């Protein structure tokens, strides 16, 4: 997966994109990540997490 490309397209930091993708691959949902994993996402909103997911 090209985390750098996703980060560029979404305008988000690559570090957080990588962590969101890892959480998604582990089976976490967008609402769960945006509510309960703010420390891993740098405080991304549910819309931003969904952008990474798509």
Regions found by a protein language model. Name each.
Residues 1-54:
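Long, charged, helix-rich clamp/arm modules that form nucleic acid-engaging surfaces
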């Amino acid at each position: 997966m090209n985390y750098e490309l996703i980060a560029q397209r979404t305008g988000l930091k690559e570090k957080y994109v990588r962590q969101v993708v890892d959480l998604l691959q582990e089976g976490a949902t967008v609402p769960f990540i945006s509510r309960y994993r703010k420390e891993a996402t740098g405080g991304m909103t549910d819309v931003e997490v969904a952008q990474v997911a798509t």
